[in-house]
């Protein structure tokens, strides 16, 4: 794998009367080879994060419009998509998720296409996809609408992440396309836990479980027998009180490897293209209902057929920047304020693990050639 993958780059500089930023992104995407993909009469999934309500760092819907319009220009049928979240918030079921997306501007009038929440109303509509060579994941649970698409395009807001280190293309694909059960598998050992204070003893979990894992004490409260649990996550999606949750016991390195393995399940065997914007590089995920000062100045737009090379190029670009004054990393006593900003932000994480594992799985190369337009 000595050959370098091409990653195309454009900065955010605009000159009067030439092109605006959406036009610049369109030119970048087409220069990178987007037009070579056969999209005629094909369903094209555009995977992105709509942002938790209250967060202001997520990608604006204008960016999604650029991609959707290019897909339609090539005869494709685009839709924006994401999967539901594990945690309480505005995106844990499809209705709330779409409402949150609308609040943040992602409606058909702004984006030129509709939204499909890939894992359905309650996050239980998934497809089990084999992962060849997976160290931790043998069968990934991917949102059905993602797998039903003929072409897959990722549109990523490149940023930090408290567990993975950074939230790039592989996180957008791997974690983002996992159903609620899939996210539980990535975040934990794959076995759920019951929050006793929320359990009302309705036994919905026992009814849906095919393995007899839910057990009930003298108060009627549920508990999960991990020796019987198969880790399917169905109880998590069926509980009406959100009393069942993931254990969140996966070490950061394991989480990163699982994300790479889930990414392989998504992209394997069909045309894919990846876009990443290094803008408003917040230290935390857009899943937060708030966002801190960006870690570094805005860098630009990147695009590639190779998601591994794309993440590496974006990471290198961020690391090369000085810390932004006012950010959590800026130290007035330090003249350089450089280094691995993601590692500095989240010392217990290591984003390199995800890229190393993805390369090992054959998802792409870390070696890249940057092509500026």
What are these regions, as identified by a protein language model?
Residues 2-63, 73-82, 87-373:
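Extended, low-polarity segments enriched in aliphatic/aromatic residues
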């Amino acid at each position: 794998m000595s050959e370098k993958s091409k990653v195309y780059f454009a900065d955010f500089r605009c000159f009067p009367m030439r092109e605006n930023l959406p036009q610049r992104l369109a030119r970048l995407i087409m220069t990178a080879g987007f037009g070579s993909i056969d999209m005629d009469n094909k369903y094209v999934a555009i995977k992105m994060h709509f942002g938790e309500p209250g967060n202001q760092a997520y990608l604006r819907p204008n960016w999604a419009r650029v991609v959707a319009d290019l897909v339609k220009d090539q005869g494709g049928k685009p839709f924006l998509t994401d999967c539901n979240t594990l945690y309480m918030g505005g995106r844990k079921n499809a209705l709330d998720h779409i409402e949150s997306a609308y609040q943040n501007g992602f409606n058909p009038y702004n984006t030129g296409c509709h939204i499909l929440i890939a894992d359905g109303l309650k996050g239980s509509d998934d497809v089990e996809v084999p992962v060849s060579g997976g160290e931790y994941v043998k069968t990934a649970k991917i949102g059905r609408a993602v797998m039903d698409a003929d072409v897959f395009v990722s549109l990523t807001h490149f940023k930090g992440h408290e567990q993975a280190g950074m939230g790039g293309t592989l996180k957008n694909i791997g974690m983002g396309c996992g159903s609620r059960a899939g996210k539980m598998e990535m975040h934990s050992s794959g076995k759920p836990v019951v929050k006793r204070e929320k359990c009302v003893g309705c036994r919905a979990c026992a009814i849906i479980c095919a393995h007899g894992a839910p057990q009930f004490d003298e108060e009627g409260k549920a508990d999960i027998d991990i020796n019987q649990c198969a880790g399917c996550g169905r109880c998590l999606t069926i509980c009406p009180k959100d009393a069942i949750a993931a254990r969140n016991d996966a070490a950061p390195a394991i989480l990163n490897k699982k994300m790479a393995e889930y990414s392989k399940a998504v992209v394997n065997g069909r045309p894919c293209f990846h876009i990443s914007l290094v803008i408003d590089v917040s230290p935390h995920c857009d899943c937060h209902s708030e966002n801190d000062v960006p870690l570094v100045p805005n860098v630009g737009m990147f695009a590639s057929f190779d998601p591994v090379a794309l993440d590496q190029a974006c990471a290198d670009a961020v690391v090369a920047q000085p810390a932004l004054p006012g950010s959590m990393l800026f130290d007035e006593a330090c003249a350089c304020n450089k280094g691995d900003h993601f590692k500095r932000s989240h010392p217990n994480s290591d984003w390199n693990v995800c890229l190393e594992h993805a390369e090992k799985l054959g998802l792409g190369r870390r070696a890249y050639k940057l092509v500026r337009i």
